[in-house]
Regions:
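Conserved beta-strand segments of alpha/beta enzyme cores
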Residues: 96, 120-122, 161, 182-186
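Conserved SAM/SAH cofactor-binding pocket of Class I
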Residues: 58-135, 139
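Short amphipathic alpha-helical segments
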Residues: 111-112, 149-152, 175-176
Length: 200
């Protein structure tokens, strides 16, 4: 999928508005500007931000109500994928995104973009600093599944859904993690990469 096709998919299939696309374009341009000085994303993906990063993040919208009310927490938010993309899409005033990122440089970028786009988000430096109150947890290129389950058990205060973007080792990680009866899951293919999976 090329960049134009990715944009068209966002509009036609995921129902992003033209205003959303404009905001995503500002996000993309800010990312490219920051990336000249800091390593926010791989330089090899700079020409495929719409398909490789934005659409990859936006596909998670299929897994919760588009008018979702409540809190979404993005663990290891990095350059804002998927958390910022989800925040741009959902304008419900009762929808709130928390971004957790340990890198000071990346937190600086997230703060700058969220202020520029007037997004309803909070930024934190460490997922272990508090008992996290969230309905949905999203992760992309974060930790291995056994570590994610451990964090979920130790830091989350209430029942929650976890949505994880994983690479080609997804099934191997599932086979090697201990899931008790409180957890159930399904796995499906990513629309942006044949080797990637989404675990819900």
């Amino acid at each position: 999928m090329n960049e134009q096709e990715a944009k068209e998919f966002l509009i036609k299939d995921l129902k992003f508005t033209e205003k959303d696309i404009d905001k995503l374009d500002i996000f993309r341009n800010s990312l490219l500007e920051f990336n000249t000085k800091y390593n926010l994303i791989s330089r090899s993906t700079e020409k495929s931000i719409w398909s490789r990063h934005i659409l990859d993040s936006a596909q998670l919208l299929k897994h919760f109500n588009i008018n979702h009310k409540g809190i979404i927490a993005d663990f290891g938010s990095g350059a804002g994928f998927p958390g910022l993309v989800l925040a741009i899409y959902n304008k419900n005033p009762e929808f709130h995104v928390k971004l957790y990122e340990k890198s000071p440089v990346k937190r600086k970028f997230l703060k700058a973009v969220s202020e520029k786009l007037d997004l309803n988000i909070e930024i934190f430096k460490n997922i272990y600093d508090e008992n996290i109150n969230a309905d949905i947890i999203v992760m992309r290129a974060f930790k291995k599944l056994d570590q994610i389950v451990k964090i979920s058990r130790e830091t989350l205060k209430k029942p929650h859904k976890i949505i994880i973007l994983k690479g080609k080792n997804a099934q191997y990680e599932i086979n090697n993690v201990s899931l008790d009866t409180n957890y159930s899951y399904k796995m499906e293919n990513s629309i942006t990469d044949a080797d990637s999976k989404i675990i819900v």
